[in-house]
A protein has these predicted regions:
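Expand to "…catalyze enediolate/carbanion chemistry for C-C bond making/breaking, isomerization
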Residues: 1-112
Length: 112
């Protein structure tokens, strides 16, 4: 597995340029991944993309040096684990408003 470029840049205090994918399509993801972004986020919350269309998008992004990220539609452990298993290097999660919800999110991202 390759290194998480975004994580390394953030640790070094460098800015990260992220692109956003709201419409499904591996060709779109591949094209965007060739535009110089450090990362691309696939939007499962407000966009038209679901898990079935996100998987080939993650594969297309992963064929480049760009870090694939995903915004899930809810703080639901099954969904978060599944998208990480599919190849997302990070998760943006909406509706995390307190310590307990943040802890739930972190737990969902940890592999036993």
């Amino acid at each position: 597995m390759r290194k998480n470029k975004v994580k390394e840049m953030m640790k070094a205090g460098k800015p990260v340029v992220n692109g956003w994918l709201s419409a499904p399509g591996a060709v779109t993801a591949e094209t965007m991944a060739q535009q110089g972004f450090d990362s691309l986020t696939i939007d499962l919350q407000h966009g038209l993309t679901d898990y079935s269309s996100a998987l080939p998008m993650l594969q297309a992004i992963s064929s480049t040096e760009v870090t694939p990220l995903t915004r899930v539609n809810w703080n639901e452990p099954g969904q978060i684990m599944k998208i990480l298993d599919a190849g997302s290097y990070g998760v943006i999660c909406p509706m995390v408003s307190n310590k307990q919800e943040a802890e739930k999110l972190v737990q969902a991202c940890m592999y036993p």
